[in-house]
C-alpha cells in the first residue's frame, strides 16, 4: 500500500504524540494566577492522587494572602473530554467552607472535601477555579487536570 507524503507526516505526528504525551495518571495542577493576584499558592495537594468516582477528593492548599478578604465570588468550570459540563458561580464566603473575613498572611486549609459523584463517567476532567475579592480583583486561579476512574 502506498501512502502519500501528507499521510506519512500525519502518521508520524500521531506516533510522536502517543510517545511524548503521557496520560494523566493522577491529579495535576497549574497556577494560572496573574502576577498581581493577592494569593500566592505555595502548596496544593490532592488525596487520593488517583480520584475515584463515589469517593471524596480531599484538597489541601497553603500559601500567602497579601490582603484581607471580606467577601468575594468563586467561579468553577468543569470540562469532560473537551465538553463543558459545569459552570458555577458562588459566594466565596457562603457555602464553600470558607469563613470571611480571611486575614492577610499565611493561609492553610485541609478541610476541602469534594465528593466525586458515583455516576461520574470515567475519563479526563479539566477544572478551572478562579476566585475574586470584594473589589472584584482576582485572588487566584487554579487549573486542574485529573483522570477519574471507577472503583
Curated annotation (Swiss-Prot):
Keywords: Lipid transport, Signal, Transport
An example Gene Ontology molecular-function term: sterol binding
This protein's record includes keyword Metal-binding: no
Annotated Gene3D superfamilies: Ganglioside GM2 activator
Signal peptide: 1-26
Gene Ontology biological-process annotations: sterol transport
Protein family membership: Belongs to the NPC2 family.
Quaternary assembly: Monomer.
Function: Catalyzes the intermembrane transfer of phosphatidylglycerol and phosphatidylinositol.
Protein's name in the database: Putative phosphatidylglycerol/phosphatidylinositol transfer protein 1
